[in-house]
Amino acid sequence: METTKKLSPIFCFSSLLCLFFTMNQAVSETDHMDTFCIDSSRNTTGNTTYNKNLNTMLSTFRNQSSIVNNYNLTTGLASDTVYGMFLCTGDVNITTCNNCVKNATIEIVKNCTNHREAIIYYIDCMVRYSDKFFLSTFEKKPNSIWSGDDPIPKSLGPFKKRLYKKMGEAIVRSSTLSSALTPYYYLDVTRFDGSYDLDSLVQCSPHLNPENCTICLEYALQEIIDCCSDKFWAMIFTPNCFVNYMITTSPLPPLPSPYHHSGSCSIRGNSEIFWGMIILAALVFTF
């Protein structure tokens, strides 16, 4: 005779909470993508005025990121002038932005000691500084590209063509948002074939004009199309813009293992994990 045991709701809920916080911590602790320390004959050594100005700037970024999701600053004079900026992705709240910028400003100094130019990419933000003015200049490099390992299902048909079309539409829309609260940020969710969603995000640095924003996003999209358009998700960060997409299923796709094209990164997983816990909880409590 078989006996069916039912878990108590309290035990189930406690287990789900433990699983959620464990997975959430794993994601949040590994969201650094890439750091680029630009080598130059202008690099400094020791406790210079330039380094002091840089530290002042990064401290200001940590404070300002608790208020706004993008900011730029110039500190110092003549050869000791530092130009810098931070930019958070438009889909994160101000707390997440602040945490990301705090981590980025600490890591960029730790990894790029005495460099007069550097850029660091996190999933939720980027921080950059230089001894040269760069804010309105369109630049393709250095960039960081990531994708999942899992291939998209054949049932989606000619996905590359469909992806190019939908992302192209998002880019056109983004270029009209230069005066938005989060300039040039656009997020789109499109249902494919009943059970698949295409989530696409595009965003430019607010200092670009609309023409250069479009050029940057089109370049970034082409990079993703060339390397990763057969994958469940992919993202690219450049000095001036971000592009990423993710295919999701109902209720959830398997969490993809990351494949890196130029650095180190993890998956943005908080929302997927959260909804996964909700769905699992609903199933458990029906028993």
Swiss-Prot record:
Residues 1-26 form the signal peptide. Keywords: Glycoprotein, Repeat, Secreted, Signal. It comes from the Eukaryota. Its main location: secreted. It is found in: Secreted. It holds the Pfam family Stress-antifung. Residues 32-134, 140-250 form the Gnk2-homologous domain. This is Cysteine-rich repeat secretory protein 59. It comes from Arabidopsis thaliana (Mouse-ear cress). The gene is CRRSP59.
